[in-house]
Curated annotation (Swiss-Prot):
The keyword Isomerase applies. The active site is at 8 (proton acceptor), 129 (proton donor). This is 1-(5-phosphoribosyl)-5-[(5-phosphoribosylamino)methylideneamino] imidazole-4-carboxamide isomerase. The lineage of its organism: Bacteria, Pseudomonadati, Nitrospirota, Thermodesulfovibrionia, Thermodesulfovibrionales. It comes from Thermodesulfovibrio yellowstonii (strain ATCC 51303 / DSM 11347 / YP87). PANTHER family: 1-(5-PHOSPHORIBOSYL)-5-[(5-PHOSPHORIBOSYLAMINO)METHYLIDENEAMINO] IMIDAZOLE-4-CARBOXAMIDE ISOMERASE. GO terms for cellular component: cytoplasm.
Length: 244
């Protein structure tokens, strides 16, 4: 199982938002590539980059920072945040990003996902944000009647690379992940699933690592605040003999 550090970008800086609120921002690094190098040095093989300005505006907002992160980091990088246009996916892939994450558009325009999966095979990740098992869209503002597992199965049929599953009631709150909901989703699909939201301790990572077939877990606030030591977490996962 991969432990995947998150780098959230706003105004060219590495930040965290509390529960997705743009009014509650903590700046961790003025130069996001410094964060990328830190996590690489601590053993990360995959980075999760979110363009928060892009999520707000619906078009790429932090391309210079994304390029600098790509130059600094040797492993795989996935990027998301307001990606709703084919040209934005093309642009990100052209600067060396490995996989592109789409979110809200998967609910609003499933045909878009179908089309980009055909154009860019195994390059598309669908981010599914859910609250009480129901899909939330528009930066968590709106909860739909669509069940997360139903959406995941539909997207799997389109040929996505995998799914990032976020339990939004727990994200950035350090309350622990929703193990049951994550396990249910992993068991329902065949594509890789990456868990996100609420990971606050090495114990949380250990619990997630017990879910067979879970591909990875994203951690943000906990590694920046020091609640999780990334090196130690990676050592424990490997020491436990959990498959990566």
């Amino acid at each position: 199982m991969q432990i995947i550090p998150a780098i959230d970008l706003k105004d060219g800086k590495c930040v965290r938002l509390r529960q997705g609120k743009f009014s509650e921002v903590t700046v961790y690094y003025d130069n996001p590539e410094d964060a990328a190098l830190r996590w690489q040095n601590e053993g990360a093989e995959v980075l999760h980059v979110v363009d928060l300005d892009g999520a707000k505006e619906g078009k790429i907002g932090n391309l210079p920072s994304i390029k600098k992160i790509r130059e600094a980091f040797r492993g795989n990088i996935e990027v998301g945040g307001g990606i709703r246009r084919i040209e934005d996916i093309e642009l990100l892939l052209s600067v060396g990003i490995d996989r592109v994450i789409v979110g809200t558009i998967a609910v609003q325009s499933p045909d878009f996902v179908k089309e980009v999966c055909k154009r860019f095979p195994k390059k598309i990740i669908v981010g599914i944000d859910a609250k009480d098992g129901l899909v939330a869209v528009k930066g968590w503002v709106e909860v739909t009647e669509i069940r997360a597992i139903e959406l995941a199965l539909k997207m799997q049929d389109y040929g996505i690379w995998g799914i990032i599953y976020t339990d939004i009631s727990r994200d950035g709150m350090l309350t622990g992940p929703n193990i049951e909901a994550t396990k249910a989703l992993v068991e329902s699909v065949k594509v890789p699933v990456i868990a996100s939201g609420g990971v606050s301790s090495i114990e949380d990572i250990r619990k997630l690592a017990e879910i067979p077939q879970l591909w990875g877990v994203i951690t943000g606030k906990a590694i920046y605040s020091g609640a999780i030591d990334l090196k130690e977490a990676l050592r424990i996962i490997k020491g436990d003999g959990v498959k990566k």
